[in-house]
Every structure is written in C-alpha cells, then in structure tokens.
Amino acid sequence: MGSEMCIRDRYIPAGIFKIRLPFIHYRWEISECLQAILMCATCLGAIPILEQILGVPYEIAWSMVIINGLLYNLHSLLGDPVVPGWITPAVPLVSAFLTQSQQGPERVKALIALQLVVGLIFLIMGISGMAGKIIGLIPNAIKAGILLGAGFSAIMGEFQDGGRFGKYPITVGIGALLAYFMLFSLLFRKMKDNSKLWHVIGNFGMLPAIIIAVIIGPVSGELPAPNLVLGSIIKVPEIGQIIHTLSPFSIGFPTLSTFISVIPTAIAVYIIAFGDFVSSEELIREADQVRQDEKVDFNANRSNIISAIRNLIEGLVCPYVVLSGPLWAAVTAAVSERYKEGRESMDSLFGGIGTFRWMTFICVALVPVASFVQPILPAALSLTLIVQGYVCCKIGLGMIKTDMERGIAGVMAAILAIKGASWGLLIGIVVYILLNGSFKNPATTAESSEEKA
C-alpha cells in the first residue's frame, strides 16, 4: 500500500496543476529516451514550413523549433499525462490561409492574430469547461467537412504543380507508401501480432519511412546526402533576432480587422484540435484501467489551459505555423502501451511522457542531429502531410452516417480546400440549415430524447 501511495502522490499540488519534475517525481526511462533521439526528426520537420510560409532563414526557423520544444514540456511539468505535438491536421488550412497575405510583416501579423485567437479559445474552453458541450452542438456533417477539407488540402498541396511530390517523386512516393503500409495496413498489423521485432518497429510510427527517405533521397539524386556537423554541439536559439523579426512587440500588433478575419480559421482549428482531447482521454482511460498502482488524472480543462499558454507565448514571441496542439497521438499511444506492461517496464506514465519530451527538446538543439536530418526535412514534411491527409479523411468519413451528411461534408470540404476556412464554414452552415431545417446535431438531439425517456 505504501508503494501505491508513493507513486500516486508524486507531485506538487498547484490548483488544477500537478507539478512533476524529472528525476524527483519520476525516473528517466531509457526506452523513451532512445525513441526521442530518433523521433526528433519529426519535430525538425517544422523548419521547412516556417521557411516557406514565413520566409525566415534556416537558423531562425531552427531556433523557433527549439523554443517550441521547450514549451512542450509544460504538459508533463504541470500534470497533463500526454505527449503534446502540433495541430497537424490544421497545417494545410493554416498554410492556405496565410498564403492569402503577402509574405513579410503582413503574413506574420496574420499568423500572430490566428495563434493568439486560437490560444484564447483554448483558454476560454479550459476555464469554463464548456468545450465538450459546445463541440457536441456542432453537427457531425460540419465537423466531418472540416476534417475532409483539411485532408484534401494536405494531399492537394503535395501533389499540385510546384508541390513536394513533383520535386522529390521517388523519395516521397516510396516513403509515403511505406508509411501507409506500416501505419494502416491490415497485413502489417498481422505481422506485428506475430513478431515482436515488427511490433517494436511499428511502435516508431512514421520514423522507419523517414529513415528510408534519408537513404533514398541521396541515392536517387533528389536530395543531398546528410552532412554531419561535429564542430559545435548545442544550438543557442537566436531569441533576439526572432523577437526583432517576428514578435508583435517589434513589428507591431495585428489590426482589429486582421483579428476578425482569422476567427473562422481559428474556430476550424479548435474543432480539429478538440478531437485530440477525446483521443487523449480514451488513451489515458485505457492505461488507467490496466495500471491500478498509479492514478492517472487526465483533465481536459487543464490540457486546454496548458495548450492555451503555449499558443499565447508563441503568438507573442515566435508565431508558429503548425500551432501548439494537445496531443501527439502516435507517441502517446506507444508510451501508453509500454506503460500498460507493468511497473517493471515503466514506473510512472509521466516517466515515459516526460523523458520523451525533455529528450526531444535536447535533441532538436543538438547541432550534429539537426545537421544530419536537414537535407531530408522537406521530404519528411511531405510524408507527414500525406499521412495526415489519410487520417483526416478516414476520421471525417467515419463521422457521417446519412446521405445528406455525406453530401454536405463533401461539398463543404471541397470549398474549404479551395477557398479556405471562411468560405468552407459559411457554405457548410448555410447548406446544412437549408437541407436539415435547423443547425441541431442529430446525435445530440437523439441523446437528449433518450435521457428524457
């Protein structure tokens, strides 16, 4: 009993937060440490997005990734039992919205406004506790349309003229097929069930596909060979240059009209991000049922508030195109699976989560690591978006049950992918009300009827 109480009480209470420090409140997990060394390449994949959308040089983009990596640790530090990440499905929508502005201060201010509004939505939902109720009121056809639109945008962006598939067809093509096979194939799922080796490899998610890209890119001549720089070890973020170039305290705050213009996109982003809270709660619930020696407390309000803090800080210091989301589902699932094997495998869930995020922060700041993966970052980003497109379409299609919902979601998704979130949301809502007669969510209405009965 004493051991159980010890692991349950390893934190410093601070209101809704439960502060946990590495080595004091949880042990360093070697497995997650090694996984983080390899998976930090995905975090560095934000660099080409920042270079392309914001027009910042590589060194500035790299510095922004390091700052973002530090902020990831707020989740394990403040008691949120998940591995956080980008709001990945929203990346195509955000990129499409930002490219409507001219590159330079105007586009940066649009991103500042968007990230601050997204942060405020997270904060309001976290403080009020209304997230679940509000999202539940939105019809599934509209939510599906947003996800399908994000999926269409991701795939269209990679395969359109000038897209990364056209630049690196062999690398991206083979890497994407391998990623699809390892992440979604029924055959590979059977291979994992029958082989511990394939099971371990499968737990690394997209990493094997990225490693293949590192090999295929230079061999095919599409990408330069990795260049391992050993002269210096640690990259010190160029905070002064970031603030001078990107911070609203230097370039000025967005106008009121800019803040108003980002609201539809911000709403779409939050609707997408809300799915992460649902996924987080389910992953943690499953782990908590298996492990009775540690009470894992997932609080969606706390997760909303921490995500708000990250977005607000970045919006004021280094606006980040991929935004700050509450969950990296693939890694959280992998950590959770090892945690469920018992205390011998992982003492505390926070040990796996904290170790992974602290180690990815350290690794993205290591010059040899960043220099080695730099040449293949565009291809790695392309693989991420192509996989995300599949996931968005799969989840979106799974949400809709009737022919009317399918039609509305499809029309809305196409408009959203071509014209942006503002047009997509507007047309989706108008068509839904026109065909359905109201904006009520049939699922919510059915649940209310059952409760009354």
Question: Where is each model-derived feature located?
Answer:
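Membrane-embedded alpha-helical modules
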Residues: 107-224, 350-453
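Helix-coil boundary and interhelical linker segments in multi-pass alpha-helical membrane proteins
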Residues: 48-62, 98-110, 159-163, 259
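Short, small-residue-biased leader/transition segments that mark boundaries at the very start
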Residues: 1-7
